[in-house]
Amino acid sequence: MDWKRSLKEKLRRDGYVRKSEQEMKEEEMSLFTNYYTEWKGGGKVSSAQNIPRFYYRLPAEDEVLQQKLREESRAVFLQRKSRELLDNEELQNLWFLLDKHQSPPLIGEEAMINYTNFQTVGEKAGEKCKTFFTSKVFSKLIPNDPYGRISIMQFFNYVMRKVWLHQTRIGLSLYDVAGQGYLRESDLENYILELIPTLPQLDGLEKSFYSFYVCTAVRKFFFFLDPLRTGKIKIQDILACSFLDDLLELRDEDLSKESQESNWFSAPSALRVYGQYLNLDKDHNGMLSKEELSRYGTGTLTCVFLDRVFQECLTYDGEMDYKTYLDFVLALENRKEPAALQYIFKLLDIENKGSLNVFSLNFFFRAIQEQMKIHGQEAVSFQDVKDEIFDMVKPKDPLRITLQDLIQSSQGDTVCSILIDLNGFWTYENREVLVANDGESPPDIDDT
């Protein structure tokens, strides 16, 4: 059979016309464009249909079925994530494997492991451990070891920390009602309330005090992690800060007295803050007036500053509740922190311009001068103090000081103390004497 003749006959019957080279190139390009567009998900559709979905509406309060479905699906997801974590038995097995594959020579008492043995342990440890046995993790932990090894203890602590972070994230996510990766105030309150029975250092707290303790603990999280006062905190931010570590430190039954006193979440600290509030509340109505708050600390906060506190902060019939008082205490006890400086700066910014000028500084310092006269102290020139403040802060604009200037100067706490607290100003004025008598406790203004 003559195939050549048969094919020509077939093409003739089908009406085939031989195309030029240019036509063939155009056809090829057209086919390529169509196939490529189809493969990329394109086509003759509007661009809006190609935008991936990025908003998922949360079920409304009356959509009970959708809410239940969402809760159940999240619970199943979190349970699956929890099962993917190493349990105590698996962690113990990992430790045995690491100890078994130590890499000589032994230097001191520190057990080390090289990269070859590190990979061997990773293969034997199981599927759950694979994420820890990567070259990236090894290079992160490698010290100045002449043999290119890492510390077994350091690596194991790294694994333990990672597992703890994931466990804690899952635990916090259970209280994330919206499922959006953040906790509202009520969510965090529920978390801490259910955490109290697991913290031996809080065993002595009366149940009647639980609500005040929870309020005290939650305020620290929101004061520092929610500076814009949105009413919610990212779970990621909670894990990244040290507050949760401080809170869970209360699991230690042998926690020293010094550690408890310096820990905001400890029972002694919470009772101290609440006790101060009760002592200030002379009329026992559960709220603080400006006159009652004026006795806070050493009683040397200026009237002008206290006026600003009650103008700017949330009050009820001109009086301050416990939650607002906690923000006030956190700001004054942590004046070096940006969140505390932001709180105080807002009170100092009487013109609401986002900066402090000479007028603002003079407005507050006049109250300091008046208090000095009352205590029989020698008057101090505002010009001298103003020049010292600008020299300390070194603002970008020589005529005004912004919040960012205060934070970057690392002198924000000193500047704030000079302007709002007579005792703070006196401490600054006599700093050279205090340094000379470093071993002695500084006297109050009344002692001078």
UniProtKB/Swiss-Prot annotation:
GO terms for cellular component: cytoplasm; nucleus. One of its GO terms (biological process) is regulation of dephosphorylation. It comes from the Eukaryota. Ca(2+) binds at D281, D283, N285, M287, E292. One of its GO terms (molecular function) is metal ion binding. The keyword Repeat applies. It is found in: Nucleus; Cytoplasm. Residues 268-303, 336-371 form the EF-hand domain. InterPro entries: EF-hand-dom_pair, EF-hand_13, EF_Hand_1_Ca_BS, PPP2R3C. Keywords: Calcium, Cytoplasm, Metal-binding, Nucleus, Repeat. Possible role in the regulation of cell death. This is Serine/threonine-protein phosphatase 2A regulatory subunit B'' subunit gamma. It comes from Xenopus tropicalis. The gene is ppp2r3c.
